[in-house]
Amino acid sequence: MNTLSFVHLTDLHLVAPGQSLYGLDPAERLRAAVHSICRRHGPDAAAPAAFAVITGDLAHLGEVAAYESLADIIKGLPFPCHLLLGNHDEREAFLSVFGGVPTTPEGHVQQALSTPAGLFVMLDTNEAGTHAGKLGEERLARLSATLEYSTDPVFLFLHHPPVASGIVGMDRIPLLDADALWQTLKPHRQRI
């Protein structure tokens, strides 16, 4: 298997400019992270990254202004950034800013990215009306077809953990169809 460096971030919880969250400015913290990432993983670094994946809770309240701030900040990355939705995200507001991201025909933000190291599968677990996650039959069917089509190693990304994390707050909002996900993955478990 080929090696590949990438950056993974999650739970940015950005708010509209000028607002704070628990006394902190999430955008300021993300700018500092991007600066560090560019220094450590930019094209001239010892370990340059091919891309970044941010696995959800991009915005705390799902505000358009927070997504606009995110778009502005990640422009500073010297490589592509793949975004997923989390339980705090609002699909319509997100897509109003990031309309060019890969989506399914049903509007779910997910994709399969072929890399020299394998297939990076990014799943949308955002479910309207709940903080819990769900894939549903359509997304699971797409995942199954993707896994059947490819024989490459698979790297799976999603916001909601498919197992109990031991963190009470997270375990209260589980991936509701985790068992169905495990059944979908089972025939391919040696590659994941």
PLM features per residue range, with description:
Residues 1-69, 73, 165:
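N-terminal active-site segment of His-dependent metallophosphoesterases
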Residues 3, 48-50, 79, 152-153, ...:
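Short coil/turn segments at beta-strand junctions that form active-site/ligand-binding loops
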Residues 3-16, 117-127, 155-159:
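Active-site-proximal beta-strand elements of phosphoester/diester hydrolases
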Residues 11, 52, 57, 70, ...:
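Divalent metal-coordination and catalytic microenvironments
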Residues 15-20, 92-94, 129-132, 164-168:
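A short acidic, helix-capping loop that chelates divalent metal ions and anchors anionic groups
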Residues 18, 152-192:
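Active-site-proximal segments of metal-dependent phosphoesterases and phosphodiesterases across multiple
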Residues 20-30, 60, 132-140, 171-175:
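Flexible, glycine- and charge-enriched loops at secondary-structure boundaries
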Residues 64-149, 175-191:
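Extended active-site neighborhood of metal-dependent phosphoesterases/phosphodiesterases
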